[in-house]
Amino acid sequence: MSSRFLKISVFIQKYRTPLLLIGCGGVFSANIFYHIFPDHTYKKVYQAWHKGEPASLSEKLQNIFQEVLKDSSISTSGNFSAFAAFGFHPVGAGVPWLPSGAQIGIPANFNSSTADLEGITNRTILINGKELEWDSDSGVALKNSLVFSLEAQKFAIAREVARLGSGGPILHAAVAPVCLAGACVYSVALKQIFRFQAGSIIFRGVVNLLSLGLGVMTYVLAADSVSQWLDYRSDRRAAGLSRDYAKGGLEFYEKILTRNKTLRSLMGQKGEEMYAPSGNLFPAHLLQLRHATYTSRRDRILNLLKNENV
């Protein structure tokens, strides 16, 4: 057993650089895979269905989508395509300059207006196993939080266009391989500092474990930082298109916060565990805050409006 372990250690030491390159390439490929083929991965997961068939995007939303691409100065609109998605706000995946392009899912409630709520009230929503009554006080509050003005709809789509158009998926996918390479650098540096290169295999193993721990911690912090930076940047780019877009962004986040507060009340204890009193999402893990909070994103757009930076 010990001889086999020794052979593996010698092999890793001998081919350390090629193995590191293969490992980093594999991790990057795994993270970017669904962005390379969004038609066959992301779209299939988020596609909305109606009567057993994929729902089609309405002409109204197709026109809004094209307007956003034009406002965003996207010269090759063929690299972006939209589909009808489930949920209550747009989602997106893909890399626009790759052959498969980028896919942006637009939810059915974007078809709704204060005069026509069909995209919302024709859904059955179960909360704690009970069907939500849209005519109840909570139902009316939730319904109102799901109706967005044209400006808010355009902002929500524009932020996805900005995120994908600026290479957000590639930046996020690059975090893990960079941290993996960093863990190897930690290991080599610590061994040289404490002169463990030719020392006991036990000490080297401890150093490797310590380096791995540092790499994991670096990844957690870096992944969150990159995600939040991308969130803020896409918001700023979308809000910077015009003052109407910025006002739409303010409305969009205000209504998300209102929706979450309503759901917190409706869901009882589970809602209190999921949503903060402010309407922000509680992080899934203690040390992770994957995305920027809704209140901070709203406040940044409000500052843009106050400072006339749009």
UniProtKB/Swiss-Prot annotation:
* Membrane-spanning segments: 18-38, 170-190, 201-221
Highest taxon, organism lineage: Eukaryota
Q: Which InterPro entries match?
A: TMEM177
Sequence ranges on the Mitochondrial intermembrane membrane side: 39-169, 222-310
Q: Where in the cell is it found?
A: Mitochondrion inner membrane
Q: Which UniProt keywords apply?
A: Membrane, Mitochondrion, Mitochondrion inner membrane, Transmembrane, Transmembrane helix
Q: Write out the GO cellular component annotations.
A: membrane; mitochondrial inner membrane
Q: Which residues lie on this side of the membrane: Mitochondrial matrix?
A: 1-17, 191-200
**What coarse category fits the chief subcellular location reported for this protein?**
mitochondrion
**Topology with regard to the membrane?**
Multi-pass membrane protein
Summarize the protein's role: Plays a role in the early steps of cytochrome c oxidase subunit II (MT-CO2/COX2) maturation and is required for the stabilization of COX20 and the newly synthesized MT-CO2/COX2 protein.
Q: Which family does it belong to?
A: Belongs to the TMEM177 family.
Annotated protein name in UniProt: Transmembrane protein 177
